[in-house]
Design a protein with these regions (language model features):
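FMN-binding flavodoxin-like domain, especially the glycine-rich phosphate-binding loop
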Residues: 2-132
């Protein structure tokens, strides 16, 4: 059963987004398709952030964050994973989380770095599942 109120937002990491969405009964949505209406109608967001090799956010995620930060996020729940990139971008990811919080969002988990040898996607999904 899919819950329209939970969205896994991704850029090019569809396989990971689909895996998370399937396990949570959520919908996977490309960040390129993110609209004000999506944000208003959704309660929980799982963001699959991606960085380019130089450490900059992808242009699609720059658009996505601009869209998210233009909205009132009060009462919205967020979990964040980094689909491509590593701990070097941790400062940027924490800054993004802080900006979401300033707009009223609640961040419910530690950041998962999918490319890290220490990451466990199933454990992370299990940890966020009751909170999402």
């Amino acid at each position: 059963m899919r819950h329209e109120s939970i969205s896994v937002i991704y850029d090019s990491s569809l396989a990971i987004a689909d895996e998370i969405a399937d396990k949570l009964g959520a919908q996977a949505l490309s960040v390129q398709s993110l609209t004000q209406r999506n944000i208003e109608s959704c309660h929980s967001f799982i963001l699959g952030i991606e960085f380019m090799s130089g450490g900059d956010l992808t242009s699609c995620w720059l658009y996505g964050f601009q869209m998210l930060l233009s909205q009132n996020l009060k009462g919205k729940v967020f979990a964040v994973y980094v689909a491509s990139g590593n701990h070097r971008e941790h400062v940027v990811v924490k800054e993004i989380c802080n900006m979401l919080k300033e707009r009223g969002a609640r961040i419910i988990s530690d950041i998962l770095y999918v490319d890290s040898s220490q990451s466990n996607l199933d454990e992370w999904i299990g940890a966020i599942s009751p909170k999402i």
